[in-house]
């Protein structure tokens, strides 16, 4: 994901406007360290398998249903609001893809719930009602009644987990806030989280965990997020089974390229290797930390949907940067996918790990799926 500098600067200009608009109700929701996530149910239930010996699991950053629109927040575009027609078409395409792959449990990132930019559609409920999933859980990472920049307005976006089976417990675990921002910017900024659920998979003590870690921090926030994610799944009972994943905004330990400025920059931006002061590097340079290459090494102690030997193969890259060639209908080339940011881990074995790069027109991230094989009793 590339940082849009206008978005970052916008928060620093909100002082006067924000103070004028403040009332008895806070503009931005601040969350407790741990609290209940929001539970959902489909409007109609579908039949489920009673005693599965395996599950197909998938993670997908769906980019709040914006597909490949050149957006002002994560690409070089200037779009801020979608029409309701655009949103529905994009969600229909996402639902069609999900219904074709048929994962049993789906980890989602960047799902909008009644946000102005996506037509105030509750995308968690919409996807439940337009797929075969029966239950869902949601944890917001950015819930603001009003963001006064660029007409953005109301925003509620976060992580979600969809399941065939009932979700018996769901909690939102707050991740640390960035410390490289002024107080006002931090107030209006994202509050990322870990969504931890317990799912009533027959004959299993089963957990699903989803997160979306920071993309643009220049301090050690990303390290804190990933360490907390690792600690969360490590604390799950060793007799239980878990899947854990999401958009970690981190490269594998074996990535040979860590500077994506030339791929990510907008036309007016310059890649000058000023990693500390040039804002283009906030989301495009993956070597800010003293040992950033090792950020995910502990997670790879677990089974991975895409194993370590294959993780850096180009067919397993999961992120693609929007570029002007996309104005040409059907454009895709060999460099379309340029890095791996999306992962699934488990404490039992995976098979048939797949990166779904053919879904290139549905988001700026490719889904990742794998079959989870339960051990024999």
Write out the residue ranges for each language-model feature:
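Surface-exposed cleft-lining segments at the edges of enzyme active sites
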Residues: 78-83, 111-113, 177-186, 212-219
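Conserved S-adenosyl-L-methionine
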Residues: 136-143, 170-176, 354-359
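Sec-dependent bacterial lipoprotein signal peptides
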Residues: 1-22
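Beta-strand-turn-beta hairpins that frame and shape the catalytic cleft
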Residues: 48-57, 155-169, 183, 188-211, ...
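Metal-dependent phosphoester-hydrolase catalytic domains
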Residues: 25-45, 233-243, 250-377
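Active-site beta-strand/loop signature of hydrolases that rely on acidic residues for catalysis
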Residues: 55-62, 93-120, 162, 197, ...
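Solvent-exposed loop/turn segments at secondary-structure junctions
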Residues: 62-65, 111-115, 141-145, 167-168, ...
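N-terminal, active-site-proximal structural segment of metallo-dependent hydrolase catalytic domains
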Residues: 22-156, 376-377
């Amino acid at each position: 994901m590339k940082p849009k500098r206008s978005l970052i600067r916008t928060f620093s200009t909100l002082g006067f406007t924000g103070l004028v608009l403040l009332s008895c109700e806070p503009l931005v929701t601040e969350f407790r360290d741990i609290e209940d996530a929001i539970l959902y149910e489909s409007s109609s239930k579908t039949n489920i398998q009673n005693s599965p010996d395996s599950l197909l699991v998938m993670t997908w950053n769906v980019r709040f249903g914006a597909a490949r629109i050149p957006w002002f927040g994560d690409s070089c575009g200037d779009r801020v609001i979608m029409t309701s027609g655009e949103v529905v078409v994009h969600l229909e395409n996402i639902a069609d893809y999900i219904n074709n792959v048929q994962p049993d449990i789906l980890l989602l990132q960047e799902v909008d719930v009644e946000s102005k930019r996506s037509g105030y559609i509750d995308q968690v409920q919409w996807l439940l009602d337009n797929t075969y999933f029966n239950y869902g859980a949601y944890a917001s990472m950015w819930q603001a009644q009003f963001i006064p920049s660029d007409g953005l307005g109301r925003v509620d976006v976060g992580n979600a987990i969809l399941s065939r089976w009932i979700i018996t417990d769901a909690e939102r675990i707050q991740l640390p806030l960035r410390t490289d921002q002024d107080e006002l910017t931090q107030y209006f900024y994202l509050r990322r989280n870990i969504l931890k659920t317990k799912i009533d998979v027959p004959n299993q003590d089963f957990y699903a965990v989803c997160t979306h870690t920071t993309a643009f921090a220049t301090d050690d926030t990303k390290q804190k997020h990933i360490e907390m994610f690792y600690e969360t799944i490590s604390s799950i009972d060793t007799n239980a089974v878990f899947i854990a994943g999401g958009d970690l905004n981190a490269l594998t330990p074996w990535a040979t390229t860590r500077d994506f400025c030339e791929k990510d920059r907008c036309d007016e931006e310059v890649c000058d290797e000023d990693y500390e002061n040039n804002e283009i590097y906030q989301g495009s340079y993956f070597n800010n930390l003293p040992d950033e290459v090792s950020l995910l090494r502990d997670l790879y102690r677990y089974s991975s949907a895409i194993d370590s030997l294959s993780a850096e193969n180009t067919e397993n890259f999961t992120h693609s940067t929007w570029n002007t060639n996309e104005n040409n209908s059907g454009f895709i080339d060999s460099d379309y996918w340029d890095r791996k940011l999306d992962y699934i881990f488990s404490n039992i074995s995976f098979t048939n790990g797949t990166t779904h790069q053919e879904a290139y027109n549905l988001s700026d991230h490719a889904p990742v799926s794998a079959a989870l094989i339960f051990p024999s009793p």
